[in-house]
Design a protein with these regions (language model features):
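Binuclear metal-dependent hydrolase catalytic cores
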Residues: 6-9, 22-248, 257, 331-361, ...
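A polyampholytic, Gly/Pro-enriched intrinsically disordered region
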Residues: 363-377
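Short glycine-rich anion-binding loops that position phosphate/pyrophosphate groups of nucleotides
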Residues: 228, 275-276, 391-392
Length: 451
């Protein structure tokens, strides 16, 4: 049936339509650029988001191609995943480079060493590792480094800095002592050799209760720490201050007032993130929703809380790491942050590179090969760090094989002449019970054994 509308009704309908059209055409309200930037600048990007002086390629970071200036900080995320292990994400580790000569590491999770080597950091120079707490996803690659760094030329102890625990048995020192025991089969093989001291660990264990205490103060670099609420006593956060620049890594834990206090106005604020969607999170983790809720609610910082905490801190750049970076959840994670924090925010996922000066910040991704080998430190570095700048010309060493292997099993080795081409036979490095070695040759400054 055809329904006829009178003039009055038609006028009312037209009025409603006009009102709806006017509402649709109203300018957007509520969101403005947090920094007062002009049109075309976005709503969260600051005017200081610009390449820093050392940046040579604005799109990607190519290792060894960009020496840092004396007033610049570079932060590289070498790992960003708590659990489960992923091809795209190693365990949490953040490398901070300061100017021309200083490098520190914050946490050292499983798989991070692969990324550090891919970034062409010489293995002997991987040192000064700060642990936020003693869950394995924050230090599991230390034993791997510990075994091979002396082989690669670090003949002095590995330096590890971390918190005490409620008891001595639960602190960083105890963990490192047990790791040395675990690796005794490896370190024993270096007995009597120049690299033997490289299997020692120099532990700086600070009192975790000393909020605001200084655990590192060298060469103009100061690192302070404070407690975090995460699973057990001992979890800590760090703030690094150097040359007017600053960096915070909270480690794991619930959002807290101490972090808001000690991280205030930091240049780069990095915290962890757990997506507060319990059923989905549990599904992806392979656990029950109960376990999911229990874990998030008691141990971690929800994505909403990341923004809340960042708003209290007011950094120049806020970042989240230690998060499973699921692409379909990027919008949700960002929306949660944006509820409370309107400033510059980014995810610190594997290979993320952040350059920082006092007036600029720039973020890129490192361009790395799938296969990479080890970069060597300079001979000058090895002489300075292994011998204090004065390298001896020769050293007397004892063969470690005599004490570590029964001669009977060595006697069963097949003669190399039976399988090696004649023109490829060389003098095999068979050590007598005691011998003198040329240190320059041993470090690689001389020649390899001749044929």
């Amino acid at each position: 049936m055809l329904k006829v509308v009178g003039p009055a009704a038609a006028g009312m309908a037209a009025g409603v339509a006009s009102a709806e059209a006017a509402e649709e055409n109203k300018p957007a309200t509520g969101e403005t650029n947090a920094y007062g930037a002009p049109p075309g600048a976005g709503i969260s990007m600051p005017p200081y988001y610009l390449p820093t002086p050392s940046v040579k390629n604005r799109n990607n970071y190519f290792p060894q191609s960009e020496p840092l200036g004396p007033d610049e900080m570079r932060i590289i995320f070498m790992g960003s995943q708590p659990w489960p292990p992923r091809l795209s994400q190693a365990g949490t580790c953040i490398m901070v480079e300061l100017g021309t000569s200083k490098r520190l590491f914050f946490d050292f999770g499983p798989g991070c060493l692969r990324n550090i080597i891919a970034n062409q950091v010489p293995v002997p120079e991987i040192n000064d590792i700060f642990l936020t707490h003693l869950h394995l996803d924050h230090y599991a690659d230390i034993p791997y480094l510990w075994q091979f760094a002396p082989f690669n030329g670090r003949w002095k102890p590995l330096r590890v800095i971390g918190p005490s625990g409620r008891t001595a048995a639960l602190g960083t020192r105890a963990m490192c002592e047990h790791m040395e025991k675990m690796g005794a089969w490896t370190s024993h093989q270096a007995a009597g050799m120049p690299m033997a001291d490289g299997y020692e660990i120099e532990v700086t264990e600070f009192d975790f209760r000393d909020d605001g205490g200084v655990c590192y103060d060298k060469d103009g670099v100061k690192v302070t720490h404070w407690r975090r609420s995460h699973a057990a006593d001992g979890a800590s956060a760090y703030r690094l201050d150097w040359n007017g620049l600053s960096f915070v890594w909270t480690g794991d834990g619930k959002p807290d007032q101490l972090t808001a206090k000690y991280a205030k106005n930091v240049d780069v604020f990095v915290t962890e993130m757990a997506v507060d969607m319990v059923s989905l999170w549990a599904l992806k983790q392979g656990v029950s929703p109960y376990i999911g809720a229990w874990t998030i609610d008691n141990f971690h910082t929800m994505h909403y809380a990341v923004g809340y905490l960042a708003n209290l801190v007011q950094p120049r750049l806020a970042m989240a790491t230690h998060v499973s970076f699921d692409r379909e959840l990027i919008g949700e994670m960002t929306a949660g942050v944006r509820m409370h924090y309107k400033g510059m925010f980014a995810f610190g996922i594997d290979h993320t590179v952040v350059n920082v000066t006092k007036d600029r910040i720039w973020i890129r991704e490192a361009a790395l090969p799938e296969t990479s080998n080890v970069a060597r430190p300079s001979m000058e570095w090895m002489i300075k760090n292994n011998f204090g700048g004065n390298m001896p010309t020769e050293m007397t060493v004892k063969s470690p094989f005599l004490a570590n292997q029964e001669q009977s099993i060595r006697d069963l080795e097949i003669d190399p002449a039976l399988f090696t081409p004649k023109d490829q036979m060389r003098q095999w490095a068979r050590m007598p019970a005691e011998m003198k070695i040329d240190i320059a040759d041993f470090l690689g400054g001389g020649q390899a054994p001749k044929k």
